[in-house]
């Protein structure tokens, strides 16, 4: 019953979002991950039997979302961390390197050349909102754990959040390195 291209895109978006939510719910039930759903849901999804320490980090996300407009907008910018590296990487890998003295022609060529030239910086920069929001959520979760738990348990929450933060940082650096190396290798192959 889809009558237009716009309706088709909306249907695809709806099905994709539902599929992602089902996957998140399943992984949370299994204790593989924990999630905070913002907006109208404003819920934390975690298996407290398997990941009891994760709840403090997720509460930190909730505080970010609900305590200030700044952190709420930083959280909304997290999509840059998903789509930014994909877009920059795709452009860096498909745009030929300009030869010495070769000029750009037009807006699209200028834009893709700029992205190609600055792919490493742009990829890393696209992770800034996610890293900032994740680290702030951990910091707020650590503070709450320190207020509510025994020193031994609070230290376990702190260590849990440190490992979590490290995975985000390593992921950002690995993706940035992959885009940089991939672009250089492609240029080297192109020259051969």
Kindly give the residue locations of the regions a language model identified.
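Long, well-structured alpha-helical subdomains associated
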Residues: 80-135, 139, 144-192
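Sequence-level detector for tyrosine residue identity
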Residues: 35-36, 41, 57, 163, ...
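Generic hydrophobic/packing signal
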Residues: 35-36, 43, 56, 138-141, ...
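Auxiliary, metal-adjacent structural segments of Zn-dependent hydrolase domains
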Residues: 1-52
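ATP-binding/phosphotransfer module of carbohydrate and carboxylate kinases, centering on a glycine-rich
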Residues: 71-72
């Amino acid at each position: 019953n889809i009558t237009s291209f716009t309706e088709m895109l909306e249907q695809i978006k709806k099905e994709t979002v539902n599929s992602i939510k089902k996957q998140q719910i399943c992984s949370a039930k299994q204790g593989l991950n924990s999630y905070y759903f913002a907006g109208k849901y404003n819920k934390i999804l975690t298996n407290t039997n398997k990941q009891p320490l994760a709840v403090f980090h997720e509460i930190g996300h909730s505080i970010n979302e609900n305590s200030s407009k700044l952190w709420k907008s930083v959280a909304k910018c997290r999509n840059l961390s998903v789509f930014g590296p994909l877009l920059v990487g795709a452009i860096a890998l498909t745009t030929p390197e300009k030869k010495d003295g070769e000029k750009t022609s037009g807006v699209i060529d200028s834009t893709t050349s700029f992205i190609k030239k600055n792919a490493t910086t742009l990829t890393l920069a696209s992770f800034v909102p996610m890293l900032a929001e994740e680290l702030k959520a951990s910091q707020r979760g650590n503070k709450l754990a320190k207020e509510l738990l025994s020193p031994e348990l609070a230290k376990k929450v702190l260590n849990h959040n440190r490992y979590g933060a490290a995975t985000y940082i390593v992921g950002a650096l690995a993706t940035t390195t992959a885009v940089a190396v991939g672009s250089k290798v492609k240029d080297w192959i192109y020259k051969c």
